[in-house]
A protein has these predicted regions:
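Non-catalytic accessory regions flanking glycosidase/transglycosidase catalytic cores in CAZymes
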Residues: 1-131
């Protein structure tokens, strides 16, 4: 099959799955940063610390909010793996990644940026340009 010369061939990426660099250039934390890895046998979880200092985790749900217990705050555990923290490190390797896409003949690329890169706490009046 012959494609026309103006055919757009491309790809797309999502910040959580691709970006990495979760604490660089003033980026704030988002709910996905507290989501662990998982498998069929052990689903992804959101980790937290209760008001009385107890650590806990609840299974993550893509389609519903993940409410934490009253008074609990999201918390990162040193012994857990959080995929979004490094991901595939597109934040540092974007030039190489785009060159790879171009090398495959792609001529368009759609990507998303984590909102907490631009507005680290969500309360800023001006965007974080470094993010």
């Amino acid at each position: 099959m012959q494609l026309s010369n103006n055919f757009l061939w491309g790809g797309a990426t999502a910040d959580f799955q691709f970006e990495g660099a979760y604490q660089e250039d003033g980026r704030g934390l988002s709910t996905h940063d507290y989501e662990t890895d998982g498998s069929v046998q052990h689903p992804r979880c959101n980790t937290f610390k209760t008001a009385d200092g107890q650590f806990g985790e609840l299974p993550s749900s893509f389609f519903a909010p993940d409410p934490l217990p009253d008074g609990a705050e999201p918390c990162l555990y040193e012994d857990r793996y959080y995929p979004s923290h490094k991901a595939v490190d597109h934040y540092h390797r974007y030039k190489e990644d785009i060159a790879l896409l171009a090398g495959m003949g792609m001529n368009v690329y759609r990507f998303s940026i984590c909102w907490s890169r631009i507005f680290p706490t969500g309360d800023e009046l001006e965007p974080n340009e470094a993010g």
